[in-house]
A protein has these predicted regions:
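Family-specific signature for flavin-dependent thymidylate synthase
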Residues: 1-253
Length: 253
């Protein structure tokens, strides 16, 4: 179990197959030729070819099951990846433990990315903690008064921790990681994504190296961006031009 934030965690519960996960990807890819696993170098080359050319089915043969605990408002982002199987704690059936995410620092609203953040904002942390404590106090009071759990939960803040089992195949997990490891993703979910990556990397080291090379550290150029490189003209859309400038910095052009 790896701790995340103040009360959260990620635990790798199980994986399929139990061993030689990289090799199982190769075996699935070669089944039509009747070949088993060849040399490690051959396996590495094939895995990199599959990932580079978006041959995704062999990666779906590997699955991981996690037990994850995170704040509700972070879980809402995490569970947007609908290709996973999920079973979550129910506040209708269970009394919610008094655990909430209480950040020590508050980030400012980004002036460029309207859904992002930047810098640090000075706030009265005592007041935010008091608000969270009050919400849980009201929740507990409602339960003591006999209010049903399915209604009493309505006063709980989004920073309340939830937990769930999450099963996903490697192909879809790489898509999740590509999005959630990106620097544009919210900091809190990036921390969870980093932990998930670190848990699976020793199990599929060849695949994860290819994933870093071709997905995380690779750059995709759009048609307008390629035309801009050829002609020297700016991309028409201001938003697309801004994204292109970021890519140019990475490329050093």
């Amino acid at each position: 179990m790896t701790r995340v934030l103040d009360h959260g965690f990620v635990r790798l519960v199980d994986h399929m197959p139990q061993q030689d996960l990289d090799a199982s990807i190769v075996q699935a890819a070669r089944v039509s030729y009747g070949d088993g696993t060849k040399s490690t170098r051959g396996d590495r080359g094939l895995i990199r070819y599959l990932l580079r050319h978006w041959h995704t089915t062999p990666f779906e043969m590997v699955e991981f099951k996690f037990h994850i605990k995170m704040p509700i408002y972070i879980a809402r982002q995490h569970l947007r990846h609908r290709t996973a199987s999920v079973n979550e704690l129910s506040a209708r059936y269970s009394v919610v433990p008094k655990e909430y995410y209480d950040p020590t620092l508050f980030r400012g609203q980004s002036v460029v990315n309207h859904q992002g953040s930047e810098g640090i904002v000075e706030v009265n942390g005592v007041e935010t903690t008091q608000a969270l404590e009050q919400a849980f106090g009201v929740y507990e009071q409602l339960l003591e008064q006999g209010v049903c759990r399915e209604q009493a939960r309505g006063v709980l803040p989004q920073s309340t921790y939830t937990e769930f089992y999450w099963k996903i195949n490697l192909h879809n997990l790489m898509h999740y990681l590509q999005l959630r490891l990106d620097h544009h993703a919210q900091q809190e979910i990036r921390e969870y994504a980093e932990v998930i990556y670190n848990l699976i990397e020793p199990l599929v080291p060849i695949t994860m190296q290819a994933f870093l090379d071709f997905r995380v550290n690779g750059i995709f150029l759009t048609g307008p961006e390629i035309e801009t490189i050829r002609t020297g003209r700016n991309v028409e859309s201001p938003g697309e031009q801004r994204e292109f400038e970021e890519k140019k910095k990475i490329l050093g052009i």
